[in-house]
Amino acid sequence: MNNIIDGKALANEILADLKLEIQGFKEKTQTSPKLAIVLVGDNPASMIYIKNKIKNAQQVGIDTLLVNLSTNIYTDDLISKINELNLDKEISGIIVQLPLPSSIDENKILSAVLPSKDSDGFHPLNVGYLHSGINQGFIPCTALGCLAVIKKYAPNLNGKDAVIVGRSNIVGKPLSALLLKENCSVTICHSKTCNLSSITSKADIVVVAIGSPLKLTAEYFNPESIVIDVGINRISNNKIIGDVDFENVKSKVKYITPVPGGIGPMTIAFLLKNTVKAFKNAIAL
């Protein structure tokens, strides 16, 4: 049995459905979703991510607007630019590519995006909806992608033990809320956790998002583990590897996502899905 999860194939299924849905919008309303991507500076890694987002958006019929601003921009000026996008009725969704330069107040910027156009799901209001169990607003895309993969291979999560290694607002915290809603018993671990392997090795599901190359080795898992590696670490020659020692772990677990080709494509698919949701909400479809 092939236990390596093909995130690209799963993402392509979502993209195919979105493409059909958007074609229907165009026939019915003569309009289509539009995603604004705000980039500050010219970080090479950010440029690669944005290129992939635009490519996939165009593939399904979502228009895009790239707003590329100087690294030297002030927080207030960036907020003003975001407000312009908030008021633009042609824009369905807005994302701000992270990380931002250290001179910019990231919390203020993420809070400036209109919650109803918050395709990334980072606005405090949307975060509050998620953690309050209110079925409203937008959920961070990587967390949605992780949950979709997990449910594909473990449809019934009732009573499952899930360990999330990493406590970020992008992955760890939102995914913990989603897994709790699925009736998992959830443990969040982080850099200060003692005896990490003794915790992860007992879990049914282990999600790793710490940004530390090949950190988790075979002894961190058991033969029934479903391992979701969210790590994206660039090493020499621009090669990308995950947080899990994939080559030595893959034969020791039930299922595992590779890096690249695992959660990355799913993140983009759910970003576009969120954008379509914002578009539908705006025109009350």
UniProtKB/Swiss-Prot annotation:
Gene3D superfamilies: Leucine Dehydrogenase, chain A, domain 1, NAD(P)-binding Rossmann-like Domain. Keywords: Amino-acid biosynthesis, Histidine biosynthesis, Hydrolase, Methionine biosynthesis, Multifunctional enzyme, NADP, One-carbon metabolism, Oxidoreductase, Purine biosynthesis. Pathway: One-carbon metabolism; tetrahydrofolate interconversion. CDD domains: NAD_bind_m-THF_DH_Cyclohyd. Its EC number is 1.5.1.5, 3.5.4.9. NADP(+) binds at residues 166-168, 191, 232. One of its GO terms (cellular component) is cytosol. Disulfide bonds: none annotated. Belongs to the tetrahydrofolate dehydrogenase/cyclohydrolase family. Homodimer. Catalyzes the oxidation of 5,10-methylenetetrahydrofolate to 5,10-methenyltetrahydrofolate and then the hydrolysis of 5,10-methenyltetrahydrofolate to 10-formyltetrahydrofolate. This is Bifunctional protein FolD. The lineage of its organism: Bacteria, Pseudomonadati, Pseudomonadota, Alphaproteobacteria, Rickettsiales.
